[in-house]
């Protein structure tokens, strides 16, 4: 199969950059509305890790789905490591149930707020980051190759940060819904094509 101009071709299939998007981490926050005795919780929760000299929260890992919950004395909980929003909800429900099982009051299902979705994608093209930095405008770009090999591009719509690498790989961070990554990739492709920096 012959791809249209601008498409990357892998074997017989034409792959659009938006089709390469993979969510690599979802971070969400919640809370149970009251303080948690972290020392007692550490003793009761199997696999919990709490070392207040290193980190002020208790780290509790769930296995299915594989996530890490950071529990704080205030009752706030941050879930990280999930690969989807569904995994965040399932992972936190496991945490809530584990807390209930050791006698900590968790009423109903606390509100869960997605804070950050990190996704990766591939433009299937080698990128000239110097030309991109100039073409996209230095006011939205950070590019210091001696400090970091990627170009940092801050988008206002969607409000995300995109890291572009010379290999054509990119990372989108700061999204609140999965569509933010897709919209960011579409926008990057459109802008780079308009500057003749991507075919």
Task: State the predicted function of each range.
Residues 1-161, 167-169, 175-199:
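Intrinsically disordered, low-complexity polar/charged tails and linkers
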């Amino acid at each position: 199969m012959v791809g249209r101009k601008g498409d990357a071709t892998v074997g017989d299939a034409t792959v659009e950059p938006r089709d390469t998007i993979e969510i690599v981490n979802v971070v969400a926050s919640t809370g149970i509305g009251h303080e948690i005795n972290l020392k007692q919780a550490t003793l009761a929760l199997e696999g919990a890790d709490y070392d207040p000299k290193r980190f002020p929260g208790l780290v509790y890992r769930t296995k299915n789905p594989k996530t890490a919950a950071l529990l704080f004395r205030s009752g706030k909980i941050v879930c990280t490591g999930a690969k989807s929003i569904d995994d965040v909800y399932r992972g936190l429900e496991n945490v809530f149930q584990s807390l209930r099982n050791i006698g900590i009051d968790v009423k109903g299902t606390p509100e869960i707020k997605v804070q950050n979705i990190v996704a990766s994608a591939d433009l299937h093209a080698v990128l000239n980051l110097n030309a991109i930095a100039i073409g996209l405008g230095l006011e939205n770009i950070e590019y210091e190759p001696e400090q970091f090999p990627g170009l940092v591009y801050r988008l206002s719509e969607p409000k995300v940060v995109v890291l572009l690498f010379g290999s054509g790989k990119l990372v989108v961070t700061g999204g609140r819904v999965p569509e933010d990554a897709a919209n960011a990739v579409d926008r990057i492709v459109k802008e780079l094509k308009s500057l003749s920096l991507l075919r």
